[in-house]
Amino acid sequence: SALVGSQKAFTFKMRKEIHRNLGAYMTPQVAYMQTLGIETMSIRFERQAATCLELAKELQKLENIESVNYTGLPGNPYYDISTSQFGPLPGAMLTFNLASREACFAFMNKLKLIRRATNLFDNKTLAIHPASTIYGTFTEQQRVAMDVDSKTIRLSVGLETGNDLLTDIKQALP
């Protein structure tokens, strides 16, 4: 009886999660749009990854940014592994640290071009504060154990130009 009850609870939770995250089913329009997106995915990814590398290099030069984490930067501890597996453009996501959690929120509130959202690999550049979103349900102690810093901003770089993104970041920095 307890096993059946726990299976029902699990099934209910999975249905709830799947419906919330993916919807009940894919409509023909969504299927069509995904087909179109797949055709240009390699071109978009190459542009996004190149922009991400450019942006990471520029962010390292800014005084208000304490550190930049991008596996495509030569100083990154995972640089050799990353470039051997993915080549010179290892992805379109980077993180950087500001002075404090409060500085992160002030920064996010001032963004104009970059959107605040938790998606990945969008055509638009997206920023989140992982400690309060993805890891928001964990205690501070748990986040520290997982090496999740409350001073970190995550960017998933889109198709905008690196110059436009850098301009938005600079104007938003505290």
Regions found by a protein language model. Name each.
Residues 2-93, 97-132:
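Active-site C-terminal subdomain of aminotransferase-like
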